[in-house]
A protein has these predicted regions:
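Membrane-proximal intracellular helices of multi-pass ion channels
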Residues: 1-443
Length: 443
């Protein structure tokens, strides 16, 4: 399919868009097969499409419990879609091409660069190989650690559970197979289990900081000054977005819990909105403030060039840096002694406005259609567009139009706002002439 799309001379953005759409379509058809469900009847088109979109877009929102509804075949299809979605369709296509010994063209290398947010085309094949090795290594290590918990509890089935949850966590998907204990229960039965909590949290964070950040850490170790500005911004922002919410949850949401459980719940609840979707606490029991904070974290999401979705940590950081620059009457925003490029600011503002607008619009429509509280619906749309998967429990009972809204938001959230814009709009080639400049008073 990759070669066919390139032969049609499509832009990188359109190849990425059609690539994800193609995998979703194939996954939908596979999930509709009779042996994909435990009833032997196959899933209805709407449920299959929703599940396939959620898996490929590594979201985790579900309309049927994964463990109790889908057969072993159906679960395997879902896991494969999670892996493809987490790695990226183009990265998977590149891996297949490299494994077959075929040469990757310059145009294909350019598409790979856009797909993984690499700074340059040079060395892109080697960098892709580094990404693939890293993904397999972290997922394997995560599975081995989880096996020490799941095999004693579930027997040999624990091997499958460990592999499934390791891949789902690393790819920031949030799909789980714990519905055999209680449908839609996620990881609530392991809320006070340190091994499960720490392993899942580490996989989520590592998968969500971005492949370029991996490379910086590998090459430069503890030498912070040698890191790219982007890696510094990602690591600093990630640290802040993990620490501050954890402190809030510790003091205001889980204060009645025993100390060890309280610490684990607080940490997990600050990590999982970073587009993972697992939960160890009952989210409906959170206060409205806690739910609103979670919505904000879900919208920000992970970092560019990672397995995570959302508007990205760098987008939030750039906008905050520019606001600070305005307060201090500086011409440009700054990070670590470097100015932020004007194009970066424009892109960040465009992404922010697109995500906020669609998040609000989707929430208002669902609230009207379903006659549900607006905060509950905004929680759902933030989870979808941030490709998170956390829910207040309303997803399975939504009407078709509400599910279609969530499907659209999940797809946009995974491919990215700018990718969608570039894929659907033609570039303006008239760059030589400029219109007259006139100032407008704002604020």
């Amino acid at each position: 399919m990759w070669a066919v799309l390139h032969k049609r001379k499509l832009s990188s953005s359109r190849i990425i868009l059609f690539g994800f759409a193609g995998v979703i379509l194939v996954g939908t058809m596979l999930l509709m097969l009779p042996f994909a469900t435990k009833t032997g009847q196959g899933a209805p088109f709407g449920d299959a499409l929703f599940t396939a979109t959620s898996a490929v877009c590594v979201t985790g929102l579900i309309v049927q419990d994964t463990a109790s509804y889908w057969s072993a075949f159906g679960q395997s299809v879902i896991l494969l879609m999670i892996q493809i979605g987490g790695m990226g369709v183009i990265t998977v296509a590149a891996a297949i091409t490299m494994a077959s010994g075929r040469k990757i063209s310059l145009m294909q290398r350019s598409t790979m660069q856009d797909a993984i947010s690499a700074p340059q085309v040079g060395g892109i094949v080697r960098f892709t190989g580094f990404i693939l090795k890293g993904i397999l290594l972290f997922e394997l290590l995560g599975a081995l650690v989880l096996m020490t918990v799941f095999i004693p509890e579930f027997g040999l089935k624990g091997i499958w559970l460990a592999v499934f949850h390791s891949i789902s966590a690393f790819c920031n998907a949030g799909f789980d197979l714990m519905g055999t204990k209680s449908p839609y229960s996620s990881l609530t039965s392991y809320a006070d289990h340190p091994v499960v909590n720490i392993t899942i949290m580490l996989l989520i964070v590592i998968g969500g900081i971005g492949f370029l950040t991996w490379q910086d850490i590998r090459q430069n170790g503890i030498h912070w000054g040698r890191y790219r500005m982007q890696s510094k911004v990602i690591l600093a922002t990630t640290g802040i977005l993990l620490l501050i919410p954890a402190i809030y949850f510790f003091f205001f949401e889980f204060s009645a819990e025993p100390m060890e459980r309280r610490i684990l719940l607080s940490l997990f609840q600050s990590v999982t909105p970073r587009t993972a979707g697992f939960n160890t606490a009952d989210l409906t029991a959170l206060s409205e403030t806690g739910q609103t904070l979670t919505i904000g974290l879900m919208l920000i999401g992970g970092s560019p060039g990672s397995t995570a979705g959302g508007m990205k940590t760098t987008t939030a950081a750039v906008l905050i840096a520019c606001a600070i620059a305005i307060f201090r009457r500086r011409e440009n925003g700054r990070f670590f002694g470097r100015r932020i490029a004007d194009d970066t600011v424009k892109n960040a503002l465009t992404v922010f406005l697109m995500y906020i607008s669609l998040f609000l619009l989707g929430g208002m429509i669902i609230s009207r259609v379903e006659n549900l509280p607006i905060l509950t619906c905004l929680f759902e749309t933030a989870s979808a567009i941030g490709t998170v998967g956390l829910t207040l429990g309303i997803t399975p009972g939504l009407h078709l139009i509400s599910k279609l809204i969530l499907i659209s938001l999940m797809f946009l959230g995974r491919i990215g706002g700018l990718t969608l814009i570039f894929a659907t709009l033609s570039a303006n080639k008239n760059t030589l002439s400029k219109l007259p400049l006139e100032k407008i008073t704002v604020g």
